[in-house]
Amino acid sequence: MTKITLFPHNFRIQKQEATPLKEKSTEKNSLAKSILAVKNHFIKLNSKLSERFISHKNTESSATHFHRGSASEGRAVLTNKVVKNFMLQTLHDIDIRGSASKDPAYASQTREAILSAVYSKYKDQYCNLLISKGIDIAPFLKEIGEAAQNAGLPGATKNDVFSPSGAGANPFITPLITSAYSKYPHMFTSQHQKASFNIYAEKIIMTEVVPLFNECAMPTPQQFQQILENIANKYIQNTP
């Protein structure tokens, strides 16, 4: 079987009427049909990208007239907004709520992954803070483990401390950041910008998934975060 490798090419997007290629009357074998379908797909995609590109350019032109700062500052502010809008659209395209409404298993796994990510983030954050203050973290780990277990997260108990089995990074952040970086790489050149986009990605994801928790006994990500913060503050405030 012939292996076809597609290599990326740099090209300029131009607004034009896209006309899908017509299938020839001869050589109607399966390989030809597959290649034709791929070509037509990319023609349509090219047209959609052209429209989106022109839309962004028009937005830039109209918004710049209302900006009171320097030209460079205006471009920076506008571009950040465009990147964030792109990330928001990417999140809508993932359609977490739609997939969850059709697949209960997906909904359950999403809730567990989100709460496990909250647990992992704040466990690391507060453990580092407590250690810096010379506070023993063992009681803290035991208590937040119990909170995670009470929240309904699956996991295992080791050395009398419960740990969620899915603890780790938020699984939806990477697709948003990766897609935005691929389209706007020049906006990810500084650590400050990267951190800003990561914070924004996490924010819109947490807002998007809240409805998934409305019909279950699990706390929302925001409620679970507050539970972990309250536990940590108890140990911090008791520091001599």
UniProtKB/Swiss-Prot annotation:
One of its GO terms (cellular component) is extracellular region. Residues 78-240 are annotated as: GEF catalytic domain. InterPro entries: SopE, SopE-like_GEF_dom_sf, SopE_GEF_dom, SopE_N_dom. The keyword Secreted applies. It is found in: Secreted. GO terms for biological process: actin cytoskeleton organization. Keywords: GTPase activation, Guanine-nucleotide releasing factor, Secreted, Virulence. Belongs to the GEF (guanine exchange factor) SopE family. This is Guanine nucleotide exchange factor SopE. The gene is sopE.
